[in-house]
Amino acid sequence: MAFVVPAAPPRTPHKFYQILYVQVLVAIVAGVLLGHFYPDLGSALKPLGDAFIKLVKMIIAPVIFLTVVTGIAGLTDMQKVGRVAGKAMIYFLSFSTLALIIGMIVANVVHPGSGLNIDPASLDAKAVQTYTSHAHDQSLVGFLMNIIPSTPISAFASGDILQVLFFAVLFGIALATVGERGKPVLDLLNPLLQVVFRLVAIVMKAAPLGAFGAMAFTIGKYGIGSIANLAMLVGTFYLTSGLFVFVVLGLVARYNGFSLLALLRYIKEELLLVLGTSSSEAALPTLMEKLERAGCKKSVVGLVVPTGYSFNLDGTNIYMTLAALFIAQATNIDLSLQDQILLLLVAMLSSKGAAGITGAGFITLAATLSVVPSVPVAGMALILGVDRFMSECRALTNFIGNAVATIVVAKWEGELDRDRLALALKGGGKALLPLEHEAAIHIPSKV
């Protein structure tokens, strides 16, 4: 017997200050300090964070398209695409619903809004008018219809993840079905994907600057002190999200044969980037590359990760039920079990109908409350000031949930190289090239 070990070029050790996650961490701390002591200057640095997010969004569509097309085109069994998508949706719906239920249970146990005694009539509904108007524009049917792009060009021009994914899946299937005639196209797309991933690496060099600007703006504009009045809600949300990640996702990871803590260490650069920018999209391209390096088949990564960004928003779901019950408790509205079940059912639907929108968490909450008559939509004004501080936690939880989901679905489908995963999670991931592009050496095993 023999096994194959990926060969990698020797790597020159980086000095600690050259490591990306160290640079991002320093940038976050510097942004907090600047925003706190010089709030006007901090607020003025918003363009740094915005520019970095735009740079990342510029390359998301090409990464998704090329990853999905080359992954699907390399399959010989087209039914496998349907199986992967079906298993991913089962996972997404199960854990998204569980996240909603956990948020509701914690809110009923902790009562973060009790004692505030807010009169609903005193709330300023105009403060959340922008979000509620966006919420009314969203519907489940409209969301599903919007997945189909008007043209392939419009999908790339708008940067809509699901539209690009939809076109990429169809293109990949078509390319696979033409057989040898499609090989020249595939031979062009594979090296092009490597060029795009190199572009990702170049863009990531600006990550510390983006994280610095985004964090300086957040602290400068809203101030750390703005958290104090609603500290119970913020603290409860962070603790609940931590419970979901380390207990629920930790058990899922353990059951499927890998360590959650090891996975978090493996994607630590991406986690710090998400923390600094409050955007899980900022780290989408590098997450896809790392999961492929860790042994997940390209076709699975290309389908599960982009879909999860719209259907597997665990952090957003926890936030929705927790925030809705907080508003009810703060305004002394007693929700019956029937009211809470209605809230849960509406949230299950609206979390899909408003997915993928900028500020999705707050807009989705508005969409939910506009349907549930018991909780005043104007109550969202209570949490408007601290929502920005909860967005980091939402983004981190969503991001970790999608990383775990991809590995689990790959394992279910038999498309996970466990040896590569073990090596990556032990710290050897950076020495691995993606499966389709690595050189290999043949080592005889002991008899």
From Swiss-Prot:
Keywords in alphabetical order, please: Cell inner membrane, Cell membrane, Membrane, Symport, Transmembrane, Transmembrane helix, Transport
Could you state one GO biological process linked to this protein?
Answer: L-aspartate transmembrane transport
Q: Which GO terms describe its cellular component?
A: plasma membrane
InterPro entries xrefs: C4_dicarb_transport, Na-dicarboxylate_symporter, Na-dicarboxylate_symporter_CS, Na:dicarbo_symporter_sf
- Chief localization class? membrane
Transmembrane ranges, per UniProt, are 19-39, 55-75, 90-110, 155-175, 199-219, 232-252, 343-363, 366-386
Question: What Gene3D superfamilies does the record point to?
Answer: Sodium:dicarboxylate symporter
GO: which molecular function terms? fumarate transmembrane transporter activity; malate:proton symporter activity; succinate transmembrane transporter activity
Q: Where in the cell is it found?
A: Cell inner membrane
Q: What's the protein's topology in the membrane?
A: Multi-pass membrane protein
- HAMAP family under this entry? C4_dicarb_transport (MF_01300)
Q: What does this protein do?
A: Responsible for the transport of dicarboxylates such as succinate, fumarate, and malate from the periplasm across the membrane.
Q: Which NCBIfam families match?
A: PRK01663.1, PRK13027.1
Family, similarity comment: Belongs to the dicarboxylate/amino acid:cation symporter (DAACS) (TC 2.A.23) family.
Indicate what this protein is called per its UniProt record: C4-dicarboxylate transport protein
Q: Which gene encodes it?
A: dctA
